[in-house]
């Protein structure tokens, strides 16, 4: 079983902000897998289904970004999951726009959602799919990640979202290394 968690903030105010790229990928993945993400459980909206024979839980934590680890920990405890069964999808401001980056494990960097998860599950050993949301050199970081995309940027983001949901499927079907080799370094621009 895999828990695939897309990070973001709940509510229409944040729906199309840069910080909600993880939620957008979960929505796309749910469409591709015909899974309804509409059940309230684990401080989240979740949906359950399968990728091949592997059970998956798609999750959109409703705890707000900085407390994402609370929702994931609740699910971990309920299903007795380990870090190897977790895929986290989140926004990233450090990789080139038009790309995604898959990592097998690692630190949180500046991402508070990842910091919360690492702290609460006490492990950095989980896969993550980082979705580029553009690079910021003009604005306060908080203002930037809570801003919306321009129409032109959103067209690029939609391609990144499609690639990210495909990558999540390949991680489950194959493994993280396979997904890294097939998606890292590719640009949708």
Swiss-Prot record:
Instruction: List ligand-binding residues for tRNA.
Output: 14, 64, 66, 112
Q: Name the lineage.
A: Bacteria, Bacillati, Bacillota, Tissierellia, Tissierellales
Name a single GO cellular component.
cytoplasm
Q: Among its keywords, does the record have Methyltransferase?
A: no
The listed locations are: Cytoplasm
Question: Quick check: keyword Cytoplasm in the entry?
Answer: yes
Molecular-function GO terms, alphabetical: peptidyl-tRNA hydrolase activity; tRNA binding
Stabilizes the basic form of H active site to accept a proton, annotated site positions: 91
Known EC number: 3.1.1.29
What is the source species? Finegoldia magna (strain ATCC 29328 / DSM 20472 / WAL 2508)
Q: What is this protein called?
A: Peptidyl-tRNA hydrolase
Its quaternary organisation is:
Monomer.
- Described function: Hydrolyzes ribosome-free peptidyl-tRNAs (with 1 or more amino acids incorporated), which drop off the ribosome during protein synthesis, or as a result of ribosome stalling.
Q: Which Pfam families match?
A: Pept_tRNA_hydro (PF01195)
The UniProt entry annotates the active site at: 19 (proton acceptor)
